[in-house]
Each structure stands twice: as C-alpha cells, then as structure tokens.
C-alpha cells in the first residue's frame, strides 16, 4: 500500500529519478505499465505516473496528474465481421472514419511529456489507416512506447510489413482463433488464415534478418467452444 505519510506535494518536490523509481517499486506501481516501457521514463513522466497511481489508489476526484496511458483508434473500420464485436456486427452507431495524421500529431504533442504507453487500436483494424506507420514512428521519436493489435488478415503492399516492423513499434498483438480455416472463420468472419500466417512468417523473417529485438510479437487464441480442441496444438504453434 501507499505510504500515507507521503503526500502528492512532497512527490512534486522530489527531483531525483532514482527516489521516485524506488517509491514506485516499493508500491508495485510498475505493474500498471508494460515492463519494456520503463526505458522511456524520465523525471517528468515518472513523477506524473507516481502521482496518478496514488490518486487512483486514494480514489481521488480532484486530480493533479495527467493520463500516462492513451488509447487512440487510427480507425473504427474493420475488414472482419467478428460476431462479439460491435464493429463486426455493425452495431455501432458511430460513423466510420480514419484518424488524420495531423490530429494524431496534435495528440502526441500535447501528451508526450507524460504519456508512457500508447495503444494504437480499439474498435477497428489499425492497418487500414495508411498513416499508421507514420504515427508509430512519430510516437517513437517522442519516446512513447507503442502497441497495436491487428488481425493481419490483409494482403499488404510490398515492404509494408518491413516498414511496420522497423517503425519503432514496441509490441504487435495478433489473435489467431483457429489453426485451420474452418475453425478460424467461425469467429474471424471474412478472415483468411493463410494470409494471416503468411504475414506472420514474413514478420518473423524480417525481425530475424535484421536482428531486431522489437516489436515483441504476441500471438493469442481467444478460447471458445469451437477451438477448444486446438488449445494444446496452439501452444505448440506459439513456441515455433
């Protein structure tokens, strides 16, 4: 628990990164951000992060901190029709749109002093935005850790995947909810498993050829009745 004797005014006056880091470690606050995002911390960011954590634990309503994690949707459009997703079902009343790079740049410029993590996805397929790689690179230049989640069920133009992998992206999440087309498309409707696997293989090849340690590749399967017989096989697939 947070030391009740340590108030926010005291923290605001601390000018030692190491002291602030120690307080975060003692209170296990770093669990709220990806461990690889710690490399982008500076004095201003860690101070805001610590204050935000204390305000959250104290259920504060009058906040002095700013958000240390942002979710920005490059688009709310998607190429799939997943039945449990409002976008896939067409249930959302929001008009489909694409985030312009100028608007994204403004968000980063306003948040770069305190934003630690940026998740560039929410209700759409982020790679449908032609400026996605440019967005990732701009966030990377401003020391912001980035993550996207993609279905990877699109045939991309030459060099797109290489540009994505070398953009500064920190983590790429891909859900593969079946190891054959019949099972895969029961949830990932309109998706093509072969395309996904080809893209995955190409990403792995690029990272190996260029000896890159990022993006971290996170592959997952949503556990459902139709794919439960493939769970063990999927765990073996992930290790390859």
Whereabouts are the PLM-identified features?
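Generic preference for hydrophobic/aromatic residues in regular secondary structure cores
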Residues: 1-3, 215
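Conserved alpha-helical substructure of the radical SAM core
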Residues: 3-171, 182, 186, 190, ...
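Glycine-centered secondary-structure boundary/capping sites
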Residues: 58-63, 211, 227, 240
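Conserved strand-turn element in the central/C-terminal portion of the radical SAM core barrel
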Residues: 151, 200-230
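Catalytic cores of alpha/beta
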Residues: 160, 225-239
């Amino acid at each position: 628990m947070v030391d009740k004797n340590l108030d926010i005014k005291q923290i605001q006056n601390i000018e030692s990164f190491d002291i602030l880091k120690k307080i975060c470690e003692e209170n296990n606050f770093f669990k709220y951000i990806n461990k690889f995002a710690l490399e982008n911390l500076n004095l201003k960011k860690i101070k805001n992060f610590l204050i935000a954590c204390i305000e959250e634990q104290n259920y504060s309503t009058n906040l002095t901190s700013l958000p240390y994690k942002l979710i920005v949707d490059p688009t709310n459009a998607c190429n799939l029709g997943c039945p449990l997703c409002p976008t896939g079902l067409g249930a959302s009343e929001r008009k489909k749109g694409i985030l312009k790079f100028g608007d994204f740049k403004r968000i980063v410029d306003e948040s770069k002093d305190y934003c630690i993590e940026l998740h560039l996805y929410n209700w759409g397929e982020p790679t449908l935005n032609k400026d996605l790689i440019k967005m990732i690179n701009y966030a990377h230049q401003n020391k912001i850790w980035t993550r996207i989640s993609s279905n990877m069920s699109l045939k991309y133009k030459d060099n797109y995947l290489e540009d994505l992998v070398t953009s500064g992206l920190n983590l790429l999440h891909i859900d593969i909810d079946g190891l054959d087309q019949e099972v895969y498309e029961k949830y990932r409707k309109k998706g093509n498993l072969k395309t996904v696997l080809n893209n995955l293989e190409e990403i792995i090849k690029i990272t190996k050829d260029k000896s890159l340690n990022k993006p971290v590749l996170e592959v997952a399967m949503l556990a459902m009745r139709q794919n439960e017989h493939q769970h063990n096989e999927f765990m073996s697939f992930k290790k390859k």
